[in-house]
């Protein structure tokens, strides 16, 4: 028989397991990688596959097994692993996964890998970040720079060893190594990791190279100085902690949050912080992003440190991708640099998520969770190149939509270059030849040039997809829903009327959408300036209400009044939250993406519904400005909750009314505002009370990181 097996079957010890099972059953034959698949030719039958499924490695996943008759040549006397073919393309490898308990114990022990940071086996370690192309063999990864020593070669060839056919097997004799240098590039004596740990303990700012990129490292008691040095005034930092006991010292995670934190994927998880966590780590928030070590280096670092927690934030120039180059990183001006000589092929930031019950809301889907895909069942090759903020691209092949790692915000040339590199790499891995390329409707987005060039290269059609329709399509694609009424709520997206949308009630399928209602339009005084100077939003609302304005001087008021007449309009839920945040004294200036909305969450969580915030729909607009007239009469938390509840209630009522008339039983929630747990709770409450099923994100990012999935789904539907 010939068995072609599809799934996560490369780089996880799958072929060695096939070998061991076949040998134990006395079978003859061969097993090989073939692009994205594994092909087994053997004299075994279905019982062999049943046994194989029962003994799968921890990281492996069999998705399908195709069987065909095959006469094994008499010349094959035994069972063996043979060289890879390359007739099939696709992503069948696992993500980078945290060092496993066996390798951790070995690294902390007294054997030949004692203290060796690159200790891994078939069950753990870097994969995607080291990989150039399929199939996953050592010569197609950056580990080809490090030929195996005899001892590692012996492990690689031993069927009983957990490093049997482990493509990145190495040791201190033959593998990558760390070095420690000062701010001028001069070597620092001593064990690199131990010395780096002592310098961090002493209050220095360091940069450490890991899998997929580099981190800026600091102790928690140096956060104010770190903010001044790095130029990050308010944006929260992620905190890496030594172990689960330390998580519980600083935070109150739910069981689901702790399960994600301790998973092999090791994302940053937003958890409720305790008073023991310094407030300046995540100012004005009731949560903090926390994660556990996932590399050997990080475990060794905490073994040597006196502190049990450290700031670990991506090392990059603001607005640019995370730095990979050892020379370029010196420009950041840290006190010391812990660097290694293993080439990073694919950059990957840490994944970031928050949990709403069992639903995973990915704020950033990257290291540990990519490559990944969703099955959509629509044939054809297509690419979606995403929006401008929180950029990703997606590539469709064989009924699946595969997404790139998190790219970043696309205003800079460096981010657009990174988008091109990551997308081209994924296209190559999948063997995709797109017939259609989808991009955002906004005419000014910097990635459009790449999209057009990509389409020209393949002779593909180019389509433009409205931003909030793409949000809806991303939710439909991951949930397997053909059509739905949905709330698509975020900061901004170019509308078909030329205005900035963002508070939308829609009916959508993959061929069209209807805009059922939207939040009241308000002027964006000064355009993009209003996104940061959020008093402009409050000023615009007070103009609509005819309210006295006492928070700007007369000259500024005159400038704002004149500018409002020619300003673009916005229906954004994000801008509505910004205006609330300013009105309630929560936030005066937006210094990072989503800041006012994030700082509203603690208020929303504590608030109760009070009378006086009821609203109505007038000519398709859900009225909001009137809520600000008497907002100061109420407790801040009650005003915040009641205003948001009133708007969500009216949006859900509008969606439910349409859904009832058209036999639809599901109502979705998508867009960046849906990351707010209180807003998700309010949405679910009203949807279920009205007798509908809420549809929420779990695998595709709620925010703009999921836009490319929706674009690609819409593009695929066009090909059918």
Feature locations, PLM:
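Conserved phosphate-binding/catalytic loops in two-lobed NTP-binding clefts
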Residues: 440, 458-470, 665-670, 677, ...
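A contiguous, well-structured pocket-lining segment that forms one wall/lid of small-molecule binding clefts
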Residues: 153, 164, 168, 175-177, ...
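Internal gly/pro-rich beta-alpha loop/helix module
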Residues: 155, 305-376, 569-570
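Conserved phosphate-binding catalytic cores of ATP/NTP-utilizing and phosphoryl-transfer enzymes
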Residues: 248-254, 300, 322-329, 350, ...
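Intrinsically disordered, low-complexity, mixed-charge
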Residues: 1-168, 172, 176-179, 190
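Conserved phosphate/anionic-ligand binding catalytic regions in large, soluble enzymes, centered on
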Residues: 205-219, 310-321, 490-500, 566-587, ...
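A phosphate-binding glycine/aspartate-rich beta-alpha loop in the early core of alpha/beta enzymes
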Residues: 212-273
